[in-house]
Swiss-Prot record:
GO biological process: one example: establishment of mitotic spindle localization
UniProt organism field: Xenopus laevis (African clawed frog)
Subcellular location: Cytoplasm; Nucleus; Cytoplasm, Cytoskeleton, Spindle
Keywords assigned by UniProt, alphabetized: Cell cycle, Cell division, Cytoplasm, Cytoskeleton, DNA-binding, Meiosis, Microtubule, Mitosis, Nucleus
Keyword DNA-binding: yes
Pfam families xrefs: NUSAP
Protein name in the entry: Nucleolar and spindle-associated protein 1-A
Taxonomic placement: Eukaryota, Metazoa, Chordata, Craniata, Vertebrata
Function description: Microtubule-associated protein with the capacity to bundle and stabilize microtubules. May associate with chromosomes and promote the organization of meiotic or mitotic spindle microtubules around them.
Gene Ontology molecular function terms on file: DNA binding; microtubule binding
Highest taxon above the source species: Eukaryota
Annotated Polar residues bias: 58-69, 106-127, 270-285, 476-494
Length: 525
């Protein structure tokens, strides 16, 4: 292997220097300047004799120790620029001089001799750096560097106490670039301890920014008033429009109709004082307070009037309209249930009787009462109930229409006109059930032949009956599952460790039986 010249060694890159050191059998994991020195000593041992500061590894370690001691005393550099070492770039060896300059400035001695020395050293370093680009370093430069490093180490030892007392803010000069700063956090932190804030002042300042409760309540009330007034206006307008639509749809005569009460079946109207036949009808005599204009907007009158007042008289046999269940005989009508305290009496089942000594009265024109003269309509009398008469048969009870509402017509009796002896009675159809004591309502004896002759209300089963208890398939499995679901339908059964252990034991038993059966040639299910 050919030894490269000194100029070639200085011109090589760091990676090439490492490769060269590996081939020469030297340690390659060194810094660039140390690696270059080691290669020079290896290839040119005469340079070792020329350089008195290189004593094997001891001189290198001495310079390293000096450099490390200087770096510890130095303040951290602020610049973060790293220079790229190119092919033509040579490693700098005079990195001690800016440290000397920085130390002399930071100490601040103020002597002219130190300032002149630093100027001279700067000029010499500039000249030396120019010479190094052309030729390798000489022995004189190395002697000077060594003497300078010794002087600076002495000065640093005497001035370390003064530097520690100074603050980091006093450091004005910028150190040499190209090195990553160490312990930058220590220099940036101020030495003063953090004081606790005055929370009272902070709370007072925050409280002054806040709004008072009175102002907030006033603002809230104004907002609520504006919102509620707009909502109220909209409600009133919608109600008014709905009322006007309802009035347009229905005529005035149909706005208010008398409510037909079931209590007026057996009660009569109050006697009227003699009225002329030329009286205005009731729908025209309605007072002004019931008119649509005078009605309150907030009064909600719904147009729905129920026609069915009780559920006992509703027709729930919907199959009569659809005719889809005619093949079944279970839909034969049964008579309505009768109460034991009432007797169902129809006008056809009783003879008519006249009311004695009934005087004629002028009929009042109303919506619920019809005035009939004797010439236009035959007289109809109130039926009387016989005490010993039994209950009406179901066939007669069927004839009464259960879906119609009863028109409450009453007999008007008046004795103000004694000169009229004729009788005027409004038509009356008494379909209500009269009360009677429960003692007279006795149950009849059961007639077996009559019940057998009646058709069945259901479809009987035809064919062979299944055996008793034979319909259940998989009895044990289904019952077991159902019982578990019944007991734990809200809390499902969670698998515990014991359950898993039992299951594992069962699986092992099954596997053992299967292996034994296969070994003996017995098929195991």
């Amino acid at each position: 292997m050919e030894a490269p010249t000194l100029s070639e060694l200085e011109g090589l890159r760091y990676s090439e220097l490492q490769k060269l050191a590996k081939t020469a059998g030297l340690k390659a994991n060194l810094k660039a300047d140390k690696l270059l020195k080691a290669l020079k000593v290896h290839f040119y041992p005469e340079s070792k004799d020329e350089s008195p500061d290189y004593d094997g590894g001891s001189s290198l370690t001495d310079t390293d120790e000096l450099n490390s001691s200087q770096e510890k005393d130095e303040p951290v550099s602020v610049s973060f620029v790293t220079h790229r070492r190119g092919r033509g770039r040579k490693p700098l060896k005079n990195y001690d001089t800016p440290k000397d300059e920085f130390l002399t400035v930071s100490v601040g001695t103020g002597t002219e001799s130190l300032a002149s020395e630093t100027d001279n050293t700067q000029d010499q370093n500039c000249l030396e750096s120019k010479k190094k680009k052309v030729s390798p370093p000489t022995i004189d430069n190395k002697h000077r560097k060594r003497s300078r490093s010794e002087d600076t180490s002495k000065q640093n030892n005497s001035e370390t106490t003064e530097k520690r007392q100074k603050k980091a803010s006093d450091i004005t000069s910028v150190p040499s670039a190209g090195k990553i700063p160490r312990y930058a956090g220590r220099l940036s932190k101020p030495e003063s301890k953090p004081s606790t804030p005055n929370f009272k002042k902070l709370h007072e300042a925050h409280f002054k920014k806040m709004e008072s409760i009175d102002k907030y309540m006033e603002r809230k009330q104004k907002r609520l008033d504006t919102v509620s007034s707009s909502i109220q206006e909209m409600k009133m307008l919608t109600k008014k429009s709905n009322l006007l639509k309802l009035v347009e749809k229905t005529p005035v005569s149909d706005i208010k109709k008398p409510v037909k009460s079931r209590l007026s079946l057996l009660s009569s109207l109050p006697p009227t004082t003699g009225a002329s036949p030329s009286r205005t009808p009731t729908n025209q005599r309605r007072s002004g307070r019931f008119s649509a204009a005078n009605k309150s907007i907030l009064f909600d009158r719904s147009g729905f009037k129920p026609s069915v007042l009780s559920s006992s008289k509703m027709n729930v046999r919907f199959s009569e309209a659809t005719k889809d269940n005619e093949h079944k005989r279970s839909l034969i009508k049964t008579p309505a249930r009768k109460s034991s305290s009432f007797l169902a009496i129809t006008p056809e089942s009783e003879p008519r009787q006249m009311l004695p000594n009934v005087k004629k009265t002028p009929a009042r024109k109303s919506l619920s009462v019809l005035a009939v003269t004797p010439e236009s309509e035959p007289k109809q009398m109130l039926p009387s109930v016989k005490k010993n008469e039994p209950m009406a048969t179901p066939e007669k009870a069927k004839k009464t229409d259960l879906n119609t509402t009863i028109q409450p017509s009453t007999v008007i009796l008046e004795s103000t006109c004694p000169q009229n002896k004729e009788i005027a009675i409004t038509p009356f159809k008494f379909t209500a059930q009269t009360t009677e004591t429960p003692n007279t309502n006795k149950k009849g004896r059961f007639d077996l032949q009559a019940s057998l002759s009646r058709p069945l209300g259901y479809q009987p089963h035809k064919g062979k009956l299944k055996p008793w208890g034979g319909s259940e398939e998989n009895k044990c499995g289904s019952n077991n599952n159902v019982s578990v679901l019944k007991n734990n339908f809200k809390q499902p059964h969670l698998q515990t460790r014991e359950d898993r252990r039992k299951q594992h034991e069962q699986d092992r038993k099954g596997k053992r039986d299967q292996t034994l059966g296969t070994r003996r040639g017995v098929p195991v299910q």
